[in-house]
Amino acid sequence: VAEGVIGGSPTSGPLPGSPGLDKPIYTISVAAEILETHPRTLMMYENIGLVVPQRTSTNRRRFSQRDIYKLQTIQSLTRQHGVNLTGVRYVLALLKALNDHGIPPPDALKDIDVSALKI
């Protein structure tokens, strides 16, 4: 997962004076650079419904900080935990359900904070 993400962390929230978590500020090329991945990968995630960036009036994608956090989580699940993309959708939904019911996640997934993600 890329380091040095601008705007705080999911648990600490945005830094003072920075845009909110849901403000669409990153173009696809900037988001890809932050995540150290190819823009086409982000387009694939969008096509299968894992992330839904907002669109400008000219139909250009804009990713929010919350989208970046979600994409980092997807990267963590696929790279560190070996989960395929179908499994990612299932794991995220399961983690959200556990979080909604106040149940802690399994030890292997404690590093994933779903509270800041829109799932």
Feature map (PLM): residue ranges:
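Conserved catalytic core of two-component sensor histidine kinases, primarily the HATPase_c ATP-binding
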Residues: R60
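Short coil turns linking two alpha-helices in DNA-binding domains
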Residues: H38-R40
